[in-house]
């Protein structure tokens, strides 16, 4: 919530939303240096779809980005029914009463040591020097069948995000950043079909 109110003069061309698969994958500074695109990475550790929706509402209250990138790992984040209801109520309360005794999204995670602190200089990007080359190069093998399910809650909030983007003249793009741990060909196929059914663009970088 704090970062989503930090908008550079002239506004934003693009924003990124998602979990830890996103905040070390897309650098707004690099986009600016190489393409002249102004952007901010609003991804946070363990971000849930409810957080994504209300954070995006907050972003649109302060800026009018042309493109919204949504990292797809959060589409598969597991929540039980109680968590889903609680998260939805928490995020609604945070949006209606920002800072009014309600947690400020990633801020409490940083304070508790559960998430890295990202500085404004990098526009939300977390500079991670611990990344190493993976040995599991066959993680996208088409013959390895795994289960992949998108819940009704995620489906419902995705529709709300699509509507929100349309209302604000922004294009929503689903993006899967490279991840040997969290991604596979089954998830690629399910996400591809999910995006096609919603009529939105999907980019898989795996």
What positions do the PLM features span?
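Generic structural signal for well-ordered alpha-helices
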Residues: 56, 158-162, 188, 192
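Acidic-and-aromatic substrate-binding clefts and catalytic sites of carbohydrate-active enzymes
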Residues: 46-50, 150-152, 180-187
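Substrate-gating cap/lid alpha-helix
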Residues: 175-205
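Loop/turn elements at helix/coil->beta-strand transitions in domains of secreted/extracellular proteins
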Residues: 11-12, 37-38, 64-67, 166-173, ...
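A generic structural signal for well-ordered alpha-helical segments
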Residues: 32, 165, 193-195
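Membrane-embedded segments
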Residues: 16-17, 21-99
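N-terminal secretory targeting modules
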Residues: 1-13
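Secreted/periplasmic serine-hydrolase-like ester/acetyl group-modifying domain
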Residues: 81-171
């Amino acid at each position: 919530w704090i970062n989503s109110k930090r908008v550079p003069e002239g506004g934003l061309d693009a924003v990124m939303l998602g979990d830890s698969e996103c905040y070390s994958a897309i650098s707004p500074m690099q986009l600016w240096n190489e393409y002249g695109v102004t952007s901010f990475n609003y991804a946070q550790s363990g971000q849930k779809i409810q957080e994504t929706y209300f954070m995006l509402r907050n972003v649109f209250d302060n800026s009018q980005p042309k493109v919204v990138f949504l990292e797809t790992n959060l589409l598969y984040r597991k929540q039980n029914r109680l968590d889903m209801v609680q998260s939805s109520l928490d995020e609604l309360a945070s949006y209606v009463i920002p800072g009014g005794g309600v947690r400020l999204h990633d801020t409490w995670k940083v304070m508790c040591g559960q998430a890295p602190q990202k500085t404004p200089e990098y526009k939300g990007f977390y500079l991670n020097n611990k990344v190493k080359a993976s040995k599991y190069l066959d993680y996208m093998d088409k013959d390895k069948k795994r289960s992949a399910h998108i819940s009704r809650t995620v489906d419902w909030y995705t529709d709300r995000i699509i509507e929100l983007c349309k209302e604000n003249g922004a294009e929503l793009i689903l993006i899967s950043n490279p991840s040997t741990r969290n991604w596979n060909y089954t998830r690629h196929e399910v996400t591809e079909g999910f995006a096609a059914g919603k009529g939105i663009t999907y980019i898989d970088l795996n």
